[in-house]
Amino acid sequence: MQHWKDFVSWADHLSQGKHRAYISMHSFSQMLISSYAVSYNEFPHEPFSIDQMNEAGKVITDAMTAVHGFKYEYGQSREILYPSAGTSKDYALEVFRIPLSWTWELRDTGKYGFILPPQHIVPNFEEVLAGMKALVGFINENYET
């Protein structure tokens, strides 16, 4: 974790505190999971940027789903997946104030699990690329650069 903190700190310094998005890529579930991951009992308030994460999440998942028809969902981890503690997205949001902080869970929804067949790799990349383009468009439209 220390190396990750050092890297994000260095990147934050280079960007002069203007990071807009943080993404931790994982498989599998086809979800964009935003902060917070911790349970409502432990952390009852909402993230400062929850409205922006939800708005961007819809734009991004719509773009990803449109590529090949594989449905992507978005929402807070504690609502659409399960509560968890110590996630990098929560740390990026709270410590570095990066407003759009997610875990992107890529293909699939369980049939293949973590062993995605080779024929799904390029289509999955195409979905991620569409999502990244949608994210950049959202940032350009909604944030000062």
Give residue spans per PLM region.
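Metallocarboxypeptidase
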Residues: 1-145
